[in-house]
């Protein structure tokens, strides 16, 4: 049996109170949570505010447990606690796991095509294949963006570009927090299908959060289902994506949940999209 890519052992995590704001009190997200995440493509599913982003930050060694431990490919994430101030530690962390933040933005004067070549050249793949770079750009429909800079992109264009960077970087695990929320539905399908291909071909594992249950059902091999009480179930996508289980997690009728998703997509489709997705 394959070793898990991420393991939590009696993990507890709380966000600290903010002294300047009496309304922001200590918030416990996880309390004694233990689980393992298998290799492959894993979707994170659950209501807002149930810990999906917090889990990704913990697994990516961007934040650290209050107690218990998180291991990534057998390495305790506390080994990377100095990554923010020690470039060597940061390099070792990023070799194992990289992170796409929700609403991630950055600006640079360098053309996107040049940045992609640099990221691939300086990344962690042992073998460099120019055709792989060209394929990333083609499959993510980045060809017309290569001469532009990140500051000129629409939200959807930037999301596709950042996904491209993450795949070129060569980390063994890529964590993505809502990586395609700004894309049109057909683009989401193409991006997720491509992520499944890349994971199968390269052995890179991908964990992503998303709200569209239809997409997560088709484009993940495993699922993490987050509940409001702080518990999390991990299993094969087809086993967890069942009416009774989803209703238990979301605490709304299954049909109503899908209706809500449909209305949300209709609302997005009706909105103007400057620059496209």
Please identify what each model-predicted range represents.
Residues 60:
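Helix-to-loop junction immediately C-terminal to a conserved catalytic motif
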Residues 68-81, 93:
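Conserved ABC transporter NBD signature motif
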Residues 103, 109-122:
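Q-loop/switch helix immediately C-terminal to the Walker
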Residues 129-145:
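Conserved ABC ATPase "signature" region
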Residues 149-153:
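Conserved ABC ATPase signature
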Residues 210-211:
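H-loop/switch region of ABC-family ATPase nucleotide-binding domains
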Residues 239, 243, 249-277:
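ABC ATPase nucleotide-binding domains
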